[in-house]
């Protein structure tokens, strides 16, 4: 569980404890309790969903997108997006509201409603960290990619002794996010060391804070955070082997030997 989630759960329990007291609360106390719960809901349900750092038409054609996955309109006036450099910051103006299930895209340059208005790229193509911070200075969401993600993405386990006969399609490699950031794995790949099998993570593959994903040898019905090589034959030799995780710039991130 991430520190942010743990904080939110603890604060929600405090409010619920107050509301469950036998003594009748004043209207002011009730209003304050609801306000606190609303603030916690917003803190939990606003996310950075994507960061386009490559620039398709030009190096300035970058953007970062946030999303309200809750059913309450969020006032994000005074919140800011912090890029990797301290002077790269976008502050949301007064009267900025994020409706339920709405996206807001913040461009690097140009005259769109939300833009850094920068004449140079904001997001480093080799790797960077984007952070959404509320008006109290609390981190709401963080998104990391490239070399900035290297310390946080590890191959944590290889289940090389499958139970399925012959194909051993239930064997898998597990990748874990050790950080409080959302890690972008788009176009990263997982390579087997003893054969030429390779799995490439599709665009928009993300690993939430302190969670894991599994890449199976051959699994048809996939759940959240599950992927498959779709190999009809076994990949992982019971006598020994290994694999490595490579990022989108062909740099090794993690390896695992058994």
Question: Can you name each region flagged by the protein language model?
Answer:
Residues 5-12:
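Short amphipathic alpha-helical heptad-repeat segments
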Residues 34-79, 120-126, 135-189, 233-239, ...:
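A structural motif detector for short, solvent-exposed N-terminal "entry" segments of globular domains
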Residues 87-118, 196-229:
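Intrinsically disordered, low-complexity Pro/Gly/Ser/Thr-rich segments with frequent PxxP/GP/PP motifs
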Residues 20-27:
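Charged, low-complexity interaction regions
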Residues 80-82, 131, 189-191, 244:
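Beta-strand signatures of extracellular beta-sandwich domains
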């Amino acid at each position: 569980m991430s520190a942010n989630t743990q904080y939110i759960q603890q604060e929600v329990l405090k409010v619920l404890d107050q509301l469950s007291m036998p003594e009748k609360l004043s209207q002011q106390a009730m209003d304050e309790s609801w306000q606190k719960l609303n603030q916690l809901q917003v803190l939990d349900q606003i996310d950075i969903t994507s960061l386009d750092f490559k620039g398709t038409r030009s190096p300035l054609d970058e953007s970062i997108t946030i999303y309200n996955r809750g059913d309450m309109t969020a006032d994000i006036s005074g919140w800011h997006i912090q890029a990797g450099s301290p002077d790269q910051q976008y502050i949301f103006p007064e009267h900025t509201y994020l409706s339920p299930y709405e996206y807001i895209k913040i461009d690097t340059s140009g005259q769109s409603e939300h833009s850094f208005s920068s004449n140079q790229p904001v997001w480093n193509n080799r790797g960077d960290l984007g952070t959404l911070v509320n008006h109290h200075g609390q981190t709401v969401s963080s998104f990391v990619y490239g070399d900035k993600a290297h310390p946080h993405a590890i191959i944590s386990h290889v289940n090389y002794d499958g139970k399925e006969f012959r194909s051993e399609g239930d064997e898998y490699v597990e990748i874990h996010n050790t950080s409080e950031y959302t890690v972008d794995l788009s176009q990263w790949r997982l390579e087997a060391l003893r054969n030429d099998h390779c799995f490439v993570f599709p665009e928009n593959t993300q690993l939430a804070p302190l969670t894991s994903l599994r890449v199976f040898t051959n699994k048809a019905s996939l759940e959240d955070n599950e992927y498959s090589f779709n190999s009809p034959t076994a990949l992982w030799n019971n006598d020994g082997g290994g694999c490595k995780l490579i990022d989108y710039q062909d740099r090794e991130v993690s390896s695992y030997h058994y």
